[in-house]
Amino acid sequence: MTASAKEEYGFFGKWWQFAKERFDPFSHSLMISLFIVAHYVVVAVDLGKKFPADFGGEGAWRHFALALGVCAFFFKLRLYDEIKDYEVDCEINRDRPLVRGLVTHKDLYSGIAVCIATEVITFGLLGTAALVAIVFSIAYSLLMYKEFFIGEQ
């Protein structure tokens, strides 16, 4: 990608273009919504409550925080995958955003840091149990990113 093409997108534009290409907003929003609703159903059944839970009123911010945190988690997994697949993409998928220069490795590492911060903040707002759960999830995702530190066979 040329410098003028990078300038054409701008900071937010390049991330929006990346998301459109590699983290389709519609399909991922649907998947994340179903993921969250499934968890709400499990909790409601476990607590013997009816579903759906109260989504309005003063507690609505909690649902928004949860959705934002879960979205950040899944987006972070996409960023990990982009970095891990870079060498293969250079040979096979030359149209990918990282390979063609829409985003850089530094951009993706910065995006990962922002996602982790978003996860910690949003889940922290939801209470200690949620914070502990996301910290374990982040740790596990980092192990996955490093493939459990297993070298190539």
PLM-predicted stretches and their roles:
Residues 143-153:
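Juxtamembrane membrane-interface segments at transmembrane alpha-helix termini
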Residues 83-86, 98-99, 151-152:
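Catalytic micro-motifs at enzyme active sites that drive phosphoryl/nucleotidyl and oxygen chemistry
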